[in-house]
Amino acid sequence: MLAASLIWGIVVILCCCFWFILGIRRRRPGEPPVENGLLPYLGCALQFGANPLEFLKARQKKYGHIFTCKVAGKYVHFLTDPFSYHSVMRQGRHLDWKKFHFAASAKAFGHGSIDPRDGNTTENMHQTFIRTLQGNALNSLIEAMTENLQYVMLQSSTSKLHSNNWVTDGLYAFCCRVMFESGFLTLFGTEFNSTQDKNLSQRETQRALILNALENFKEFDKIFPALVAGVPIHVFKSAHNAREKLAEALFHENLRKRNNISELVTLRMFLNDTLSTFDDKEKAKTHLAVLWASQANTIPATFWSLFYLIRSPEAMKAATEEVQKTLGNAGEKIDLDGKCISLNRKQLDNMPVLDSIIKEAMRLSSASMTVRVAKEDFTLHLDNDSYNIRKDDIVALYPQLLHFDPDIYADPLTFKYDRYLDENGEEKTIFYRNGHKLRYYYMPFGSGIAKCPGRLFAVHEIKQFLTLVLSYFEIELLDSNVPCPSLDQSRAGLGILQPTNDIHFKYRLKCL
């Protein structure tokens, strides 16, 4: 017994020595300071995941504006000086922004690699998204989203709104239902040819299917951070089933039965069929990736925008006046006779108050991370220093450090609806840090060539949502003094953070 214990003790000691020798990176000359963490493989992952912002602030104070941390088997160089961000952007020949995203998509959604270098497809997905989510294509999306938002808000649940009584709901649940249903109809089409085809039975059937898809989406989305981290989805049986059900609805044979499908999905179906070797299930899972990308950040961004708007009387007053002025200038009248309010892209772009509210809400809730993978050993040249970076290491920017910097944003934890308005009430685009003008001051959508191609549509649909809510509804928080919910840190690095709890509110149709 004693001998066995001694043997096991020796084995443990040898394993520890082996890990110490091979599992710990030693800093070479010219490299940033490195922190390996105490846990094999995980390194600093648990500390970082618990509260990324505080973790990075502490390391910034200890090591300076650039440092390296081992996180889940990868060595990540965090760059914290916003004046050095452009140095990362301009050294693109050494850094690959696609590799990390392609790998994360394959792990999370279960399709084969979408990296053209791996031979499954020759589609340039980033160009597909730019082509179908910006320019003239954006105008069609805005038009469709306006119609679908009003259908969902006013017709999809008319039984609740017939009387003049208040309807009580969870604010996040409300935003989730409205934005998911409207966004799904806008991108993936309807089961009817036009609004005139919608009888009650068809409406209820379509709504039941989409709300069922929403439940599957939420079940799958809950474990999304774990999937990106590399945990196999089979560990999560219910989430795995939810993902497969979502994908089943997006098979090409099912999508072809739908009407008014967006240009994005139509083009992706064509390119999947002509440029890829994916089977039907993998094609569907690439569409699931589009669905997730269109909803996972837009829904919480909508919630935070509406929550801060309702909570601030000054913001409510300014936003309501802007909406009324914009509708009046457009000759749009608010009524409930079935005629939709219609604002085009130019009119929506000329709403700086709503734009500032959305930006401020996203500044307070965004925890995205800009990631680049080193293609080779190279020297990262910053304005005043140079650092050696090893092949396959990750260079990361964490914009929440920027967004919460009191030297850039006075009282950074407080919502100020006019923070992004200048003295003339127009968009403010000039910000300073320690007296020096910043090139990068607002980065919820990433930066450079990897900037989210759907960002324009996302902002426009939130702006449409707020415009319609302010136009059609009286809306109040049940508790006007309710504290702001905490941010769910489990999703840090993925975009807009969800609230840890919902907020109760009430709404009813205005007497028009």
Annotate each language-model stretch with its function.
Residues 315, 438, 443, 455-492:
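Cytochrome P450 heme-binding "Cys pocket" and the immediately downstream C-terminal segment
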Residues 139-302:
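Cytochrome P450 heme-thiolate monooxygenase catalytic core
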Residues 268-328, 361, 396, 454, ...:
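Central I-helix of cytochrome P450 enzymes
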Residues 1-4, 13-18, 474, 492-512:
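C-terminal helix/juxtamembrane-tail motif
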Residues 45-57, 333-386, 391-396, 402, ...:
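Conserved cytochrome P450 K-helix E-x-x-R motif and the immediately C-terminal K′/meander segment
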Residues 397-432:
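Conserved cytochrome P450 K-helix/beta-meander segment immediately N-terminal to the heme-binding cysteine loop
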Residues 20-30, 55, 78-82, 106-149, ...:
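Cytochrome P450
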Residues 2-112:
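N-terminal membrane-proximal hinge/A-helix region immediately C-terminal to the signal-anchor transmembrane segment
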